[in-house]
């Protein structure tokens, strides 16, 4: 059951969504929440990272936490129905569902779930995330999983869409080398600072995406205590993989650019498995970011 409480120690008195402790994912599972500015490539990053973990022999579950339910289509090669849609079909009697009703097998055995969400302007996305985890636990689908990846909607950091942080060991932030992406990243750091007071989630690092250079990201990292875990340039093969509805690991291996991207994802996955040192980053005030970034 999901409850809404007011807890000043978590988010400076804002209304937060807190999950039932019974919904906690077992300690031995690596749980990663992927955040970033809307449209920055979180789903691409999440799906390719899931594929990389699977290539390393891990049992992987990816949970899309966006009403658009497009997180996993490069893994499954199709748009799959959402948990909220399936629950509506059975009038929210979850006991009537079977795992195959809402869990779909994708590339290299990656298990895929799209939580979906309430209609625009209504309901709470955090509730839907909680219901998804509850379903997975009821059907014992988390017991045989090594890695869980939450792919989270845009840069929304309200109590609802911060809910995956309550399950995660690490948060990865996807960003480009521009002001808007880094500004959004700073807000996400603030959300993680709030959640880390009461939950185990810690910052894992930054994924630089669609960027030839990282000078602005490097400035921000140095000032806040973040680090870049992986760097993906604006490679056309990544764009083409989305159009082909597949992961980067299903593209032509003979292409050196494809190989480079594959290797970077494998390196990132291995680093996360090696239990990276969590970061104690400090967010900046809006004016500080404005003064820090850019050129004199």
Swiss-Prot record:
Binds 1 [4Fe-4S] cluster per dimer. It catalyses: chlorophyllide a + oxidized 2[4Fe-4S]-[ferredoxin] + 2 ADP + 2 phosphate = protochlorophyllide a + reduced 2[4Fe-4S]-[ferredoxin] + 2 ATP + 2 H2O. GO terms for molecular function: 4 iron, 4 sulfur cluster binding; ATP binding; metal ion binding; oxidoreductase activity, acting on iron-sulfur proteins as donors; oxidoreductase activity, acting on the CH-CH group of donors, iron-sulfur protein as acceptor. GO terms for biological process: light-independent chlorophyll biosynthetic process; photosynthesis, dark reaction. The keyword Nucleotide-binding applies. Keywords: 4Fe-4S, ATP-binding, Chlorophyll biosynthesis, Iron, Iron-sulfur, Magnesium, Metal-binding, Nucleotide-binding, Oxidoreductase, Photosynthesis. Belongs to the NifH/BchL/ChlL family. HAMAP family: ChlL_BchL. Component of the dark-operative protochlorophyllide reductase (DPOR) that uses Mg-ATP and reduced ferredoxin to reduce ring D of protochlorophyllide (Pchlide) to form chlorophyllide a (Chlide). This reaction is light-independent. The L component serves as a unique electron donor to the NB-component of the complex, and binds Mg-ATP. This is Light-independent protochlorophyllide reductase iron-sulfur ATP-binding protein.
């Amino acid at each position: 059951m999901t409850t809404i409480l007011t807890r000043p120690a978590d988010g400076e008195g804002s209304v937060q969504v807190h999950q039932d402790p019974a919904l906690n994912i077992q300690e031995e599972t690596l749980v990663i929440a992927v955040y970033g500015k809307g449209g920055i490539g979180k789903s691409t990053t999440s799906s390719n990272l899931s594929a990389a973990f699977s290539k390393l022999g891990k049992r992987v579950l990816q949970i899309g936490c966006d009403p658009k339910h497009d997180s996993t289509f490069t893994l499954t090669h199709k748009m799959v129905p959402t948990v909220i849609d399936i629950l509506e079909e059975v009038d929210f009697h979850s006991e009537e569902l079977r795992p195959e009703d809402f869990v779909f097998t994708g590339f290299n055995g990656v298990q895929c779930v799209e939580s979906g969400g309430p209609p625009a302007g209504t309901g709470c996305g955090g509730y839907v995330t909680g219901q998804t985890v509850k379903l997975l636990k009821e059907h014992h689908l988390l017991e045989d999983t090594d890695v869980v990846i939450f792919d989270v909607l845009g840069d929304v950091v309200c109590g609802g869409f911060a809910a995956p942080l309550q399950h995660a060991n690490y948060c990865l932030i996807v960003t480009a080398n521009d002001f808007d992406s880094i500004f959004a990243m700073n807000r996400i750091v603030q959300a993680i600072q709030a959640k880390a007071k009461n939950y185990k989630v810690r910052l894992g690092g930054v994924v630089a995406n669609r960027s030839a250079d990282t000078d602005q990201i490097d400035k921000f990292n140095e000032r806040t205590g973040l680090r870049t875990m992986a760097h993906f340039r604006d490679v056309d093969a990544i764009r083409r993989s989305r159009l082909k509805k597949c992961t980067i690991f299903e593209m032509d291996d003979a292409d050196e650019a494809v190989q480079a991207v594959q290797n970077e994802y494998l390196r990132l996955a291995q680093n996360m498995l090696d239990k990276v040192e969590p970061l104690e980053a400090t967010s900046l005030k809006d004016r500080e970011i404005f003064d820090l970034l850019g050129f004199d």
